[in-house]
Amino acid sequence: MSEKQKKRQWHTPAERIMMTGFGVVIILGTLLLCLPVSSASGKGVYWLDALFTATTSVCVTGLVTVPTATTWSVFGKIVILGLIQFGGLGIMACMIMIFLVLRRKISLQSRKLIQDTYNLPVLKGSVGIVRRLLIGTAVVEIAGAICYSFWFVPHYGLWRGIGYSIFHSISAFCNAGIDLVGESSFAPFVTNPLMNVTTMGLMILSGLGFPVWWEVIEHVQDLLKGKRTRKNFIRGFTLHTKLVLTTTVILITGGALLILLLDWNHTGSLGDLKPGEKVMAAFFQSITTRTAGFETIPQKNFTDGSAMVSMILMFIGGSPMGTAGGVKTITVALLIVLVTSYIRGNHDTVVWGRKVVEENIRSAVVIFFFALTTALTATILLVAVSGHPLLDCAYEVVSAVATVGLTRSLTSQLPAAGKIIVILIMYMGRIGPITLAVALGRRTRHVDADIQRPEQRILIG
């Protein structure tokens, strides 16, 4: 293959590894879940339900066709937990973890794959970044499990309580939203501050993304050591961290306020709760729609207005290099900045005195368009094959493509064709935006960049 042909190649090893790696793990997970030992009855589970469960676990979505608590045996639940952890960390992080445990030397090619997978600006320190990611994940998941144990251990006994605490901590942090409580998810905990705060904390942390973690921690350390003052604490953040934190606060607060406004007196959702409980439930709904997919109030019980707000939040999702799905907060933030800059007559896209590179803008536009097109197409197909109401199907599709896992009681009622559609869009939702971001972020893929072509204006609007 000539150098010119290599430059024209779209797919990179990192992209192929991500796509095939997730696919292979889903297949292996399906085979394990099909075994009789994986089911609570000992008779095995229908292959399509096993495939659906493996896909929703690896893609950290949370939609399920069969109740997790009663369908699967202890072995089956361990398999699901392993798939969730793999899906949350990603194939490269898991591979590096194995190398570190076995004390194997990590090759230059593997380091390059890490750089491509996480879209890192430089190759140096890539393994260290993954190591910090793994350590950070372990610390937060252990802390979450300890918090959960204060409720699960007294109610389920020591060993079962510990197991449930670990399962739900990993599920919440990896944004899977799969639970062992029952068919009503976290509805029994709608008024429980401990379970709500713990779950919301895990979901927010994972949704922020690891780069934001590290930068905030470094700034706090500098502040404590006297290297940084309170005045320049926030100013010292990178543009990425500023955008993530600002967008996250606006989405969480704005979403909760809209849900409170729309459902304050609505029977079945917030109307049956006390004022303080309404606020807690609204914030939980606002956070879970962008991340994990646990629910303290059945989604079908919300008004159509709140359902639309939830769909928007699901579509946006979390932040880059986090475990949440969606088009990402940065994508939406850049599009908003692009529009405001255009309205103001600015040639460049500028935010907080910094010019955003054109490459990032193009990536944001393509990722947003890709996700929107996928959601619209899948909604049409799901309505056609299932015959269910448009809102329920659209909610299901957006939840799947954004890997959230919330449903308006539709997943278990889907026909085989509907389940296959949801399986495909869960996979596309987990792989698509990541692959596009990596692909569009590589400068080596500019085709014939040295050729100057004539410009021509076209009519718009």
Give the positions of each predicted feature.
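Membrane-proximal intracellular helices of multi-pass ion channels
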Residues: 1-461
